[in-house]
Structure formats: C-alpha cells, structure tokens
C-alpha cells in the first residue's frame, strides 16, 4: 500500500516530563502513524503541550475550560490536508496510565484520531459517524501493531 506524502512539523512546548514525551514520540514514528491515517497528502503540525497551554487552547477555541487530550485544527481537507494537532502531555499520560496502555500506544491512537478529524471524520455528529471513525481507528492501529484502543 502506497502511503500519502506528509510534511510534518513536530513541536514540544515546555512542561514537566517533556523528555519522557519526546522519547515516546520519535519523529519517524509520529510520521508513520499519521501517514497510515491519511487519505490524501498533508501538511500537519503536531504540538505537544503542557496542561496550561492545553487548557488555554481548549478554552479559547472550544469554550471548554479544561485541558483535553487532543485538539484538531483543520484548515483544508481537499485536495491537500492542512492541520494542527495539539496533544496535552499530562492528559495523555494520565489516560494511558488509567487505561493501562503504554504512552506510545496512546499517542499513536490520539494522532490517528486527530488525523481522521483533520480529514472530516467526526465522532460527535452521531452514533453511525462515531462507529465509522472508531472502526477506522481500530483498523489503522492494528495495521501499525497496536491493540484495539477501545478495549
């Protein structure tokens, strides 16, 4: 299977335990995970942030005053995907621990999830859409060697 091209910018904000998150996110892995979720060529920025920045972005752009695991800012979907994916490191780490997943497996899931959002998939528009998106995530992650993230 030929994968779509990806121009990737990987950024890390300043936050406690940043080195742990950098180690879990080698650039080649992040690119591989995203490329497997792409249905067209893309330019994507991935930014890993601390709780304060994550909360500010969620508050400012979604009117929800808490840090969330992943935010997707999609600018174009066709013929070329352009998007920013912002992942909040402390939230991702807590969720991984709570769900007994490795940090890397949870990041892979959230990057696939965010990449699908960037292409127009939305699990919040109805049960059928949620099932379609989850099925795609499970299939993509299985192809990457990760377990079903919803178990």
UniProtKB/Swiss-Prot annotation:
It comes from the Bacteria. Gene3D superfamilies: Metalloproteases ('zincins'), catalytic domain. It is an enzyme of class 3 (hydrolase). GO terms for biological process: rRNA processing. GO terms for cellular component: cytoplasm. Pfam families: YbeY. Zn(2+) binds at residues 113, 117, 123. Its EC number is 3.1.-.-. It is found in: Cytoplasm. Keywords: Cytoplasm, Endonuclease, Hydrolase, Metal-binding, Nuclease, Ribosome biogenesis, rRNA processing, Zinc. GO terms for molecular function: metalloendopeptidase activity; RNA endonuclease activity; zinc ion binding. Binds 1 zinc ion. HAMAP family: Endoribonucl_YbeY. Belongs to the endoribonuclease YbeY family. Single strand-specific metallo-endoribonuclease involved in late-stage 70S ribosome quality control and in maturation of the 3' terminus of the 16S rRNA. This is Endoribonuclease YbeY. The lineage of its organism: Bacteria, Pseudomonadati, Pseudomonadota, Betaproteobacteria, Burkholderiales.
